Amino acid sequence: MGRIRQTFIKRTGEELIEKFADKFTSDFEENKKAVEEVAMISTKPLRNRIAGYVTAKVKKMNA
């Protein structure tokens, strides 16, 4: 079983996908940079978790 993501991460990821859908791809490294550009995330681990969530959502949408 996988880890359950916090509501804050899910909510932020969903909002970023809605507003900036064209910036995100299925590549985690690119999404890290995109999250850093468009959102004011205070810590690196939080940025990485949000980028990971966005990456998973994009992969699901494209599958």
UniProtKB/Swiss-Prot annotation:
The keyword Electron transport does not apply. The lineage of its organism: Archaea, Methanobacteriati, Methanobacteriota, Methanomada group, Methanococci. GO terms for biological process: translation. Belongs to the eukaryotic ribosomal protein eS17 family. Keywords: Ribonucleoprotein, Ribosomal protein. It holds the Pfam family Ribosomal_S17e. PROSITE patterns: RIBOSOMAL_S17E. SUPFAM superfamilies: Rps17e-like. Coiled coil: none annotated. One of its GO terms (molecular function) is structural constituent of ribosome. This is Small ribosomal subunit protein eS17. One of its GO terms (cellular component) is cytosol.
